[in-house]
Every structure is written in structure tokens, then in C-alpha cells.
Regions:
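C-terminal motif of bacterial Sec signal peptides marking the signal peptidase cleavage site
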Residues: 18-20
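Solvent-exposed coil/turn segments that connect beta secondary-structure elements
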Residues: 33-35, 43-45, 92, 145-149
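C-terminal cell-surface addressing/anchoring modules of secreted/extracellular proteins
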Residues: 183-200
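C-terminal membrane-anchoring or membrane-association module
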Residues: 198-210
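One face of beta-strands
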Residues: 24-42, 117-123
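Bacterial N-terminal signal peptides that target proteins for export
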Residues: 1-9
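Intrinsically disordered, low-complexity linkers and stems that provide flexible hinges
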Residues: 108-184
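Structured domain cores in non-transmembrane regions
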Residues: 43-114
Length: 210
């Protein structure tokens, strides 16, 4: 199903390129265990939508919401006179997120990991090269919802754990970097942890009696 979800994302991006639409929103939500969801939204003006519908001879199901695989949600959203097609794809770990990212040309992952109680996000996006999927955009918004409080970042905007970058179009390679805390909520200490402590105490007690 992961391949199907990737195809859905690529179809949305391909439609954007064909229609001449220049707006993209990417939002990645990462949980403390590395799972999460990736949202990619493509915005079409009323004129762009009309032209695309004429090309495809399809005035209904503009975002193809009925063709999404079970693990992918496709949402059609109206914002004033713009139509946004948004894909929501879950991922079970950071390796799956890496695979989703790498389906697009023009993105390089430097670091994407949870280690030593910290989440590190370091990604380059190419907004200039002709071979990059991101070079056609006049508006690009990239957001990451961190698993914990931000420690260090180079984002343009911060709202609690949500970081947002607004790269200048055709400005070259943009580095998106952030580091955050990772809550320990993913590990349930009792009763398992308490049991381990109990076993350790018993071993220590009997060890002293010898």
C-alpha cells in the first residue's frame, strides 16, 4: 500500500505541473516513536481548475478522492476561489517518511533520526534546478510538527511545536533544519519497569545474604 500512497502523491504533483499551478503546502507530523503523517496540498485557482477539468473531461471528483488506497486520505478543500487537493499519508517510522520524501526530485535528506532523546530534522529542498519538482512553485510552505519542544531550528515561524518555512521561490537550495526534545511517553515505565526494579531488588537482597 505504501507504493500506492506514493503514486497518489506523485499524481497530485504531476497534475500541478501540467496545470501550471504554483502553490504547494507540505506538512509533516512526527510522533515521539517516529511514526506520523505526511500531508501534501496542491492549490488550484478557479481558472486552473477549469482548464484542468477541460483537459481531462472530468468535472466531478476533481481530486480523485474515490481512487485513494485504504491507507491514504485525499481531501478536496475550498479556500475562497481556490481548490486544494490534499493527500494525507501515514508512516510507521522515519524510514517510511524518508521513502515518501525521496519519491520527489529535488529533496535531499541530511539527517532524519531520533537519537539520545532528541529528534533531528535536516533536509535540503532545491527550488531552482529544472530537474527539481519544487522549482515551479511561486508559493511554497513547508511545516513540521515536532514530537517535543524545539531546541534549535532555522524556521521562519514557530507556533509551539510547529515550525514553518517559507522558502523564496527559485532561490537555490534551501536548508530546513530543526532539533527537538522527544517525550518519554512512548515508554510505559510501570508495570514493566517496576517489575524490572523488583527483580533487581530481589537479586540484590539475596546477593547480600550470601
Amino acid at each position: 500500500m505504501k507504493c500506492q500512497s506514493i503514486k497518489i502523491i506523485l499524481l497530485v504533483v504531476s497534475a500541478l505541473l501540467l496545470a501550471g499551478c504554483h502553490k504547494l503546502e507540505v506538512m509533516t507530523k512526527v510522533e515521539s516513536n517516529g511514526s506520523g503523517e505526511l500531508q501534501m496540498g496542491v492549490g488550484f485557482s478557479a481558472e486552473e481548475r477549469t482548464n484542468l477539468e477541460k483537459q481531462n473531461n472530468n468535472a466531478q471528483g476533481f481530486c480523485n478522492t474515490s481512487q485513494a488506497p485504504p491507507n491514504v486520505t485525499v481531501i478536496e478543500e475550498q479556500r475562497s476561489d481556490e481548490t486544494w487537493c490534499i493527500t494525507v499519508t501515514p508512516f510507521k517510522d522515519l524510514e517510511e517518511l524518508r521513502s515518501l520524501y525521496e519519491q520527489s526530485q529535488g529533496i535531499k535528506i541530511n539527517r532524519l533520526e531520533i537519537s539520545d532523546g532528541k529528534f533531528t530534522y535536516d533536509v535540503d529542498v532545491d527550488t531552482l534546478s529544472e530537474t527539481s519538482d519544487f522549482s515551479v512553485f511561486t508559493v511554497l510552505t513547508w511545516s513540521v510538527i515536532l514530537p517535543g519542544a524545539p531546541i534549535e531550528h532555522n524556521a521562519d515561524q514557530v507556533d509551539a511545536n510547529t515550525l514553518t518555512w517559507n522558502p523564496t521561490p527559485e532561490s537555490g537550495i534551501i536548508n530546513l533544519r530543526a532539533e527537538s526534545e522527544v517525550p518519554r511517553g512512548g515508554f510505559s515505565f510501570p508495570p514493566c519497569g517496576a517489575a524490572l526494579i523488583g527483580v533487581g531488588a530481589v537479586i540484590l537482597f539475596f546477593g547480600r545474604r550470601k
